[in-house]
A protein has these predicted regions:
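Aromatic-residue-lined binding/catalytic grooves and analogous aromatic/hydrophobic interfacial grooves
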Residues: 22-450, 456, 462-469, 474-475, ...
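Juxtamembrane membrane-interface segments at transmembrane alpha-helix termini
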Residues: 492-494
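Catalytic activation segment of kinase domains across protein kinase-like and atypical kinase folds
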Residues: 498-503, 513, 518
Length: 543
């Protein structure tokens, strides 16, 4: 079977819904990513998440590193970035486009139409959990795994004849990160652990009850002071041995077993309100999580996760290469008919959406929920000219419909902030969203005109609302979102103009995202009547 045919079969299977939803079929296969060495760089770490918290587990025996995220740690604060000069200059840009002076139009738009206050805020890392194990630099029989069946990582290795095991979950039900440390001989669990952060001016303290706290605030960016306050709390529960806490370091010596707990919380309530108490929230998560055993916590977590996972299975045959590490299977894929790797990849995609988008939280951003930087590429925002939409394309067709709730709430919120932007920039009713937004739900045109002069982000997101109705037949949902659809349609009804050559109604100025066109001799993206806009607006008006 060649690769084109294999992926063609996969596409057909997904498209027509020929995917069994039987728990027994899924249980017969084991879906996991596994490796025989620790991660060397962040992109090799294994992702865990519960929608709100993200963790990237490196699995290094001597110095475990788990990079941590909390979904509401973003730079900046509530704001609107619409440029009031746009109202005057958009007609001038439009005239230049209709005159065929595309590059001149694009240059003017960059100078006078695009946002001048900020281009949206970056999603930011919280920091890292570090766990140091003295004497574990020389190890053998190493194994590292991400189980897609149970949403947990496992690390095993051997030092001086002792077998060590680490199991990590980002609990869906307890909303904390837990790391269970065990060995096959008593009294062998000894480690020091602490929280670190790339943020400036963080405060790290040791509190009574063997607890370490790390408190900070998000970053200044493009002149907008960070106002998201956050706190992480670190503690442990040991069986046997001794535990102590001083100078921001938690130490356990000679234990039979230990559970490390991390909770993180912020002051973020919604895009307009950041008056929450991160310390109280973080403490509450931790206290509630420690009222039951790790075994119970893991079962609750796994049961919650599998309610989503087991709705859909994809069986492409035997796992004939199960003895080969995942990185080698990917490398060998050109030469092998590894159909089970395709099925694993399918479930991995579902896994990532389950872990990065849960009802009540934020949508999955450019990097889902995982980011190790303060200023990541493209700010790890919500890019609405295909990326945000792509995150959610699998949601309905793979039976994860309710995971759209964070996306739908974002759409509802930008439909409110976008009303002001439509008025300020276009003098229009309805609402507009350009090619990017962030946690503050900015809707102005950002970056430079070649990428950002595109007012159809709202129309594309509205398609997701309509598809929810098509998949579910939920008339109550449709009734609740109809005003959003109507007001997006109203905006385009008011801003579309007749182009002079044919009197066609078009959106102008706009662009086909990141595509230059022949009319400009390949020098400009700025144009009128782009096919993408035409299709999106047709879909919106005929929904």
């Amino acid at each position: 079977m060649n690769k084109k045919r294999l992926f063609g079969y996969l596409f057909v299977l997904v498209s027509v819904g020929n995917i069994s939803a039987q728990e027994s079929r899924l249980s017969a296969q084991e879906y996991k990513l596994w490796y025989d060495r620790p991660a060397q760089v962040w992109t090799e770490a294994l992702p865990l998440g519960n929608g709100r918290l993200g963790a990237m587990v490196y699995g290094t025996p001597a110095t475990e590193q788990i990079q941590l995220n909390e979904e509401t740690i973003w730079a900046g604060r509530p704001n609107n970035n619409a440029n009031p000069n746009a109202l005057e200059y958009i007609p001038r840009v439009r005239d230049l486009v209709f005159a065929g002076k595309y590059l001149e139009a694009q240059t003017l738009a960059t100078e006078k139409v695009m946002a001048k206050t900020n281009s949206g805020m970056p999603y930011q890392s919280f920091g890292d959990l570090r766990i140091a194990f003295p004497g574990h630099t020389r190890y053998t029989n190493y194994y590292r795994e991400l189980s897609l069946d149970s949403a947990r990582t496992l690390v095993r290795y051997e030092v001086d004849g002792v077998q060590y095991r680490r199991e990590t979950i980002t609990s869906f039900t307890d909303q904390v990160i837990m790391v269970r440390l065990t060995a096959n001989r008593p009294g062998r669990i000894t480690f020091n652990t602490q929280l670190t952060s790339p943020h400036q001016d963080v405060v790290i303290t040791s509190e009574e009850g063997n607890c370490v706290t790390l408190s900070g605030v998000s970053s200044l960016h493009e002149g907008l002071k960070g106002k998201v306050e956050f706190q992480g709390r670190l503690t442990a529960r040991n069986t046997g041995g001794q535990m102590a806490c001083a100078d921001g370091v938690l130490s356990v010596e000679g234990a039979d077993e230990a559970i490390v707990y991390v909770s993180i919380a912020t002051n973020f309530n919604n895009y307009q309100d950041i008056t929450g108490n991160p310390a109280e929230r973080a403490k509450d998560y931790l206290v509630r999580a420690m009222t039951h055993s790790f075994t119970e916590a893991r079962k609750n977590h796994t049961d919650f996760y599998r309610r989503y996972l087991t709705r859909v299975s994809l069986d492409l045959g035997d796992n004939r290469y199960e003895h080969v590490t995942t990185d080698k299977r990917v490398e060998n894929f050109k030469q092998t008919n590894d159909a089970h790797l395709v099925a694993t990849y399918f479930q991995f995609g579902r896994y990532l959406l389950i872990c990065s988008s849960q009802p009540g939280g934020q949508p999955a951003n450019l990097q889902g929920i995982w980011n190790d930087k303060l200023f990541p590429s493209w700010d790890s925002k919500y890019t609405c000219n295909i990326n945000l939409e792509m995150n959610y394309w699998p949601s309905e067709v793979t039976n994860l419909s309710e995971l759209n709730e964070p996306l739908f709430r974002l759409i509802r919120e930008v439909s409110e902030t976008g009303k002001e932007t439509a008025r300020i920039m276009y003098g229009a009713n309805g609402w507009v969203l350009h090619h990017n937004t962030d946690i503050w739900r900015i809707t102005g045109a950002v970056d430079k005109a070649p990428s950002g002069l595109w007012p159809s982000g709202g129309a594309w997101l509205c398609r997701h609302l309509w598809e929810r109705y098509l998949y579910t037949g939920d008339t109550e949902f449709l009734r609740s979102v109809y005003p959003i659809l109507r007001e997006s349609g109203r905006f385009f009804d008011e801003i579309m103009v007749k182009e002079p050559a044919h009197n066609w109604l078009v959106v102008c100025p706009s662009n086909s995202p990141e595509n230059v066109h022949s009319g400009s001799n390949g020098k400009s993206t700025t144009a009128a009547g782009c096919t993408l806009d035409n299709q999106l607006i047709f879909n919106l008006w005929t929904a």
